[in-house]
Structure formats: structure tokens, C-alpha cells
């Protein structure tokens, strides 16, 4: 949670890309973002490189992205860990929907591209740990626009307490209302469909670290008014309110990959 204290952080589900993959039912999240009339599906990969192999791994992912684009897939959106959780890379693979992503022709092209580049063998040598999640999120065009303008990211990942998913989603929206009132960037909200345990994760996109920390300059009276308008008792109560609904919460600061 990025609230007014600004604690600036210093600190398998493997998907087979073959035509034989059984396509899961196409369902919409119960708490889809209001701006997402047709929920957009992403495959989200959290990856930790083998020791000393991060730059090599980034190069292989760049090659894979180029090959997949030729096969008809959308280019991924990604970032590199700076401080926080243990993953090195977060990669958002645009899918759209299960049905379109796993169309036999498209899946076949993807498989041929992987085989031609011997990608599976390379990834086995370069990856120490990987976690995959399928999640519904914002329209791809909105995300690309934000990533094109930003180079610094704040990622928050949550596992909700039993029965508290709806309240957690609402809290994420409340924080966006708070941020909007202070003229700060709002978070993109993603909702789990299947895969890793994270129920919700959000990505805040900023120009740089200085932009991320600018909220500390907001006047106390403006913070107070924004918090109450969003439904919080006070700015200092945003964190305690969030903790009512979560079992686990990971924060990460990340930077763009050029």
C-alpha cells in the first residue's frame, strides 16, 4: 500500500502452448474493474533467474517476444525488480481470452517458434524459480499507454482472507479514489482467474522514483479530505483498513526494461 508515510521500499502452473491444451471455461471476474467492459486476460509470469544469469535470461525473453510477435501474439509488457519481493522479472503476456489465445492455428505457430529457438532448453538453464498466474486486468491499450510513459513501477500482490475478496477489491478501488483526488496515478487492478495463489495484484506506473515519492508533498489537509472522500477514516488508517482483508501482501518496486 502506497500511503502517506511513503515507506519507499529498500528492502507450477506451466502453460502448454499446444493445440491439445484443454481450454478452461471463459468466465469473467466477479469484481471486474469498472472500466473493463470486456475483461482482458493476461498470463503473468514471476521469474527468478539462476545466479548470474539475469541478463542472459532477459536476452532470451527478448528473442522469444520477437518470435512470438511474428507468430501473431502481442508483445509482452515487463519490468525488472529493484527492491522488494524475490522475483527478478514480472512479465505480462497479453492473451485477450482463452479461446482466442488457444486457437489451434495460433497455438501451433507459438509452438513452432518455441521449438525453432530451442527456448525450453534455454529457460531450463537460466530460470531458478517461476510462478504463473492467469488474471483479468485493464484493457491492453490502457496498459501499453501507461508503460510507454512510465519507467518505475510499484507492484502490490495480495492473498485475501477467506470471504474477504470483495472487500479487498473494494479497498483497492478506494485507494484509487484517494490517489485520483491527490492527482496521483491510479493503480491498474488485476484479478486472479487461475494459477498462483495471488487473488489480486495492482501495478502503479510512474515516471521515476521521484514521481512515485511526490505524494509525500501533498498537504495534510488535502490528504485528509481525499481519504475521507474515498471512504477511509483518515490517511493514517488506510494501512490498518487494508490489513483487515489480507492474509499475505508483497510489495515490490521495479524498473522498466529497455
Predicted regions and their residues:
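Short S/T/G/P-rich N-terminal loop/turn motif that feeds into the first structured element of a domain
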Residues: 22-258
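Bacterial N-terminal signal peptides
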Residues: 7-20
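N-terminal secretory signal peptides that target proteins for export/translocation
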Residues: 1-6
Amino acid at each position: 500500500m502506497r500511503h502517506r508515510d511513503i515507506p519507499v521500499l529498500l528492502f507450477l502452473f506451466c502453460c502448454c502452448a499446444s493445440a491439445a491444451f484443454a481450454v478452461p471455461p471463459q468466465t469473467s471476474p466477479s469484481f471486474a474493474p469498472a472500466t473493463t467492459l470486456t475483461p482482458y486476460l493476461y498470463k503473468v509470469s514471476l521469474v527468478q533467474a539462476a545466479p548470474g544469469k539475469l541478463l542472459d535470461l532477459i536476452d532470451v525473453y527478448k528473442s522469444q517476444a520477437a518470435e512470438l510477435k511474428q507468430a501473431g501474439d502481442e508483445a509482452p509488457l515487463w519490468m525488472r525488480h529493484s527492491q522488494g519481493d524475490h522475483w527478478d522479472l514480472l512479465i505480462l503476456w497479453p492473451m485477450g481470452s482463452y479461446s482466442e489465445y488457444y486457437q489451434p492455428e495460433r497455438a501451433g505457430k507459438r509452438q513452432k517458434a518455441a521449438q525453432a529457438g530451442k527456448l525450453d532448453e534455454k529457460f531450463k538453464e537460466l530460470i531458478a524459480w517461476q510462478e504463473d498466474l492467469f488474471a483479468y486486468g485493464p484493457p491492453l491499450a490502457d496498459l501499453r499507454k501507461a508503460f510507454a510513459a512510465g519507467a518505475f513501477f510499484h507492484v502490490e500482490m495480495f492473498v485475501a482472507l477467506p470471504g474477504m475478496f470483495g472487500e479487498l477489491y473494494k479497498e483497492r478501488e478506494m485507494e484509487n479514489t484517494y490517489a485520483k483526488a491527490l492527482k496521483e496515478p491510479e493503480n491498474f487492478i488485476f484479478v486472479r482467474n487461475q494459477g498462483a495463489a495471488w487473488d489480486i495484484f495492482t501495478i502503479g506506473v510512474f515516471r521515476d522514483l521521484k514521481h512515485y515519492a511526490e505524494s509525500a508533498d501533498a498537504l495534510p489537509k488535502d490528504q485528509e479530505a481525499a481519504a475521507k472522500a474515498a471512504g477511509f477514516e483518515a490517511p493514517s488508517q488506510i494501512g490498518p483498513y487494508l490489513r483487515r482483508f489480507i492474509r499475505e501482501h508483497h510489495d515490490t518496486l521495479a524498473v522498466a526494461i529497455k
